[in-house]
């Protein structure tokens, strides 16, 4: 990522350090740190308004692609397709992940405020990532938007045809629809009283990828291990649900135990 050399950037840097996040590849710039203003309704659902700054200046580093070798690479930036150095870097890193035999995960993180009346461009820019990823995580809104289908099972069929072998569609309190070309199953979530859903989807995919990273076989084979995949998603559902019971994003994520 890329942070500004300002108070917000310093705050984020300190917060990530406190949570033992490796910042060795994090970049800084004199452009102000990108801001997301979040409003929350009475059900804990949130809406976003963005003031875009430093994130768009993320520079591609060709000398780190060896770090992707047979590792896991996740693409999940909400602002990744809005132009600038970040979008160029995104494309380069997708190519690097492919050439290094990485397990590729994709979350489009569609935000209405960022795209307004230009959703068609967003869809077009997502297609290569859906085609090349081993795992795609969508919200209901994203699955319908990207597939052009209103029914989720039909949406999954279209998204599989585009290339995604494993699809997880998060549905809030109703759990997650897990789909492969051969099978579909809805995994129930944990019942909670939500106060702030900010970061729930990120907590879900973070938990799922953390579990996948601990497999003793290639995660590319996960689509053939459905019972294991369903159990992983059930745990990730719980993590996402618990995240909604507190305000904030990072501070609300439950500990692994």
What residue spans do the PLM features occupy?
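Acidic, amphipathic alpha-helical patches
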Residues: 63-64, 126, 194
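Conserved beta-alpha-beta core of the PfkB/ribokinase-like small-molecule kinase fold
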Residues: 78-157, 164, 174-175
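Conserved phosphate-binding/catalytic region of the ribokinase-like
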Residues: 95, 150-257
């Amino acid at each position: 990522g890329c942070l500004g050399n300002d108070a917000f950037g310093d705050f984020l840097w300190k917060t990530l350090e406190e949570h033992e996040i490796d910042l060795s590849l994090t970049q800084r710039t004199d452009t102000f740190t990108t801001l997301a203003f979040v409003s929350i309704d009475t059900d804990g659902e949130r809406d976003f308004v963005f003031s875009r700054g430093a994130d768009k200046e993320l520079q591609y580093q060709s000398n780190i692609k060896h770090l992707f070798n047979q590792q896991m690479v996740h693409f999940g930036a909400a602002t990744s397709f809005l132009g600038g150095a970040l979008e160029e870097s995104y494309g380069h890193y997708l190519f690097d992940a492919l050439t290094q035999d990485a397990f590729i995960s994709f979350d489009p993180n569609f935000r209405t405020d960022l795209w307004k009346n230009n959703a068609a461009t967003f869809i077009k820019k997502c297609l290569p990532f859906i085609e090349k990823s081993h795992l795609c995580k969508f919200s209901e809104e994203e699955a319908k938007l990207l597939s052009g289908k209103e029914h989720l099972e039909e949406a999954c069929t279209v998204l599989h045809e585009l290339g995604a072998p494993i699809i997880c569609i998060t549905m809030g309190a109703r759990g997650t629809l897990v789909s492969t070309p051969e099978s579909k199953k809805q995994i129930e979530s944990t019942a909670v009283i939500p106060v702030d859903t900010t970061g729930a989807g990120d907590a879900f995919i973070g938990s799922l990828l953390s579990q996948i990273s601990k497999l003793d076989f290639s995660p590319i084979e996960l689509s053939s291990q459905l019972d294991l995949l369903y159990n992983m998603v059930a745990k990730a559902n719980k993590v996402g649900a618990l995240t909604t019971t507190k305000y904030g994003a990072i501070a609300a994520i439950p500990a692994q135990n």
